[in-house]
Amino acid sequence: MHAVSMTIIGAGSYGTALAIVLARNGHHVLLWGYNPQHIRELQEYRCNQAFLPDVQFPDNLCPEDSLETAIKASRNILIAVPSHVFHQVLYNIRPYLDQHSRIIWATKGLEHGTGRLLQEVAREILGDKIPLAVFSGPTFAKELAIGLPTAITIAASDTEFSEELQQLFHFDKSFRVYKNSDMIGVQLGGAVKNVIAIGAGISDGMGFGANARIALITRGLAEISRLGIAMGAELSTFMGMTGLGDLVLTCTDNQSRNRRFGMLLGQGVDIEEAKKQIDQIVEGYLNTKEVHMLAQRIRVEMPITEQIYHVLYCGKSVSEAANALLSRQLKDEMYDTVRF
């Protein structure tokens, strides 16, 4: 019998925030991170001084430095790590899983180097029998941790699992959880919105104003939807929390690292200096390459993503990228929706 309701792998800002929410909801939670010194600090100070210094841990949130202990303590394993290490984390935890284990992830992105959905990665490494679920939606870790009202979406490989997770996380005072059966759409929305957010930041950094920002968000949503439909997702998913909701949040609020990174580029800061100034992982920078790779592989037109890719990886200037988008052939607004 597992004694812990949830083990969370990843003691960054988002993993910590999710652990706090679960613990406040009365559940016993273990929080594991790869850096033993960081875990010792969490244990000593009972808060995450590096990322959420003003939020104290509930008594039933326990930082744990042993991966084996953390995994074996609960059947529910939630992974909240950057997308480029997701693959390795699955390999690391696999020896400690048992026949009752279930995997959830809050990682937003595609597999580094392949552009595969994280669901595909999990199935390849863990097999077909283990239940899978993904968390996504418009959430900033700080607001989640301090208890401001937040809504999120869960998509799982079976209905019973998603309903159980919905009940586990739902907190009447501040945290509302929706179900969605479309795992593909939920994953893609969370991955591609970071790329579009860099574009929104570039636009604002260049001083293009509110009109341009909203046009970019709207056409970005069209790109996400077009890619999703080609991958087998439901169009309605992109009108919800993990599509429109997460996209608008990430493109318009300066808590978003992706938006801030783009703003620096738009102001003329070079890529390496912009990454240095953000001083945390910019998922959109990593995922632009993977999203571009995926779009080319399945032959889906994504002009905003393409121009951001050229800026980040091919040396194109932000002004050249903006001109390329503005000078594209005129289109019917719905051309890219009805073609599927």
UniProtKB/Swiss-Prot annotation:
NCBIfam families: PRK00094.1-1, PRK00094.1-2, PRK00094.1-4. Its EC number is 1.1.1.94. It is found in: Cytoplasm. The active site is at 193 (proton acceptor). The keyword Repeat does not apply. HAMAP family: NAD_Glyc3P_dehydrog. Its main location: cytoplasm. This is Glycerol-3-phosphate dehydrogenase [NAD(P)+]. It catalyses: sn-glycerol 3-phosphate + NAD(+) = dihydroxyacetone phosphate + NADH + H(+); sn-glycerol 3-phosphate + NADP(+) = dihydroxyacetone phosphate + NADPH + H(+). Catalyzes the reduction of the glycolytic intermediate dihydroxyacetone phosphate (DHAP) to sn-glycerol 3-phosphate (G3P), the key precursor for phospholipid synthesis. SUPFAM superfamilies: 6-phosphogluconate dehydrogenase C-terminal domain-like (SSF48179), NAD(P)-binding Rossmann-fold domains (SSF51735). Sn-glycerol 3-phosphate binds at residues 108, 137, 139, 193, 246, 256-258. The keyword Transmembrane does not apply. Belongs to the NAD-dependent glycerol-3-phosphate dehydrogenase family. GO terms for cellular component: cytosol. Keywords: Cytoplasm, Lipid biosynthesis, Lipid metabolism, NAD, NADP, Nucleotide-binding, Oxidoreductase, Phospholipid biosynthesis, Phospholipid metabolism. GO terms for molecular function: glycerol-3-phosphate dehydrogenase [NAD(P)+] activity; NAD binding. NADPH binds at residues 13-14, 108, 141, 257, 281, 283. Pathway: Membrane lipid metabolism; glycerophospholipid metabolism. One of its GO terms (biological process) is carbohydrate metabolic process. InterPro entries: 6-PGluconate_DH-like_C_sf, 6PGD_dom2, G3P_DH_NAD-dep, G3P_DH_NAD-dep_C, G3P_DH_NAD-dep_N, NAD(P)-bd_dom_sf.
